[in-house]
UniProtKB/Swiss-Prot annotation:
GO terms for molecular function: monooxygenase activity. This is Monocyclic monoterpene ketone monooxygenase. It comes from Rhodococcus erythropolis (Arthrobacter picolinophilus). Signal peptide: none annotated. Keywords: FAD, Flavoprotein, NADP, Oxidoreductase. Its cofactor is FAD.
Amino acid sequence: MQTIPSTTETAADFDAVIXGAGFXGLYALHR
């Protein structure tokens, strides 16, 4: 884990939440 959160990582996490159980969401969570 990085000490400084990246903007892309935050956006991916937010997208995962929107996505929910969607494939994109799972991909973002795995990534």
